Each structure stands twice: as C-alpha cells, then as structure tokens.
Curated annotation (Swiss-Prot):
Induction: By bacterial infection in fat body, hemocytes and malpighian tubules. Transmembrane segments: none annotated. Shows very strong activity against S.aureus. Disulfide bonds join C39-C70, C56-C75, C60-C77. It comes from Oryctes rhinoceros (Coconut rhinoceros beetle). Pfam families: Defensin_2. This is Defensin. The lineage of its organism: Eukaryota, Metazoa, Ecdysozoa, Arthropoda, Hexapoda. One of its GO terms (biological process) is humoral immune response. Fat body, hemocytes, malpighian tubules and midgut. SUPFAM superfamilies: Scorpion toxin-like. GO terms for cellular component: extracellular space.
Length: 79
C-alpha cells in the first residue's frame, strides 16, 4: 500500500510540474520588443516644458530600472 501511495505522489508531482511550466511559445513571444508610447506619441513641448525624457524615465523607474532617456524615438532604460 505504501508503494502505491509513493507512486501516486510521484505521478501527481510530475503532472503538477508539467502544468506549472510555461509554454515555449509564451517564452518566445515575450522577447519581442514593442515600441513605447513615451518617446513617440507623448513627446511634446509646451511653454518650455518638454515631457519626452521625463515620461521615459518614469516608465523605466516603474519597471525597476534606474531611469532612462529617449534616443531616436525609443525609450532606453539604464541598468
């Protein structure tokens, strides 16, 4: 009886492990970079106030980086 319980536990752990692993397609799709709105559409200047670099820096701070700046319309975050 104890062998059956151990075998059932091992099978259950293998099934749980296979269900918890991410699908390979999901890993590849997350690598694709998409353009950010902070440097393209939200770049504006009004009465001497330019919001392009500050919005990019805020975006980078929100994802845990140490700030950032716009370079050729792309937000580049510092490490």
């Amino acid at each position: 009886m104890s062998r059956f319980i151990v075998f059932a536990f091992i099978v259950a752990m293998c099934i749980a492990h296979s269900l918890a692993a991410p699908a390979p397609e999901a890993l590849e799709a997350s690598v694709i970079r998409q353009k950010r709105l902070t440097c393209d559409l939200l770049s504006f200047e009004a009465k001497g106030f330019a919001a392009n670099h500050s919005l990019c820096a805020a975006h980078c701070l929100a994802i845990g980086r140490k700030g950032g700046a716009c370079q050729n319309g792309v937000c580049v975050c510092r490490r």
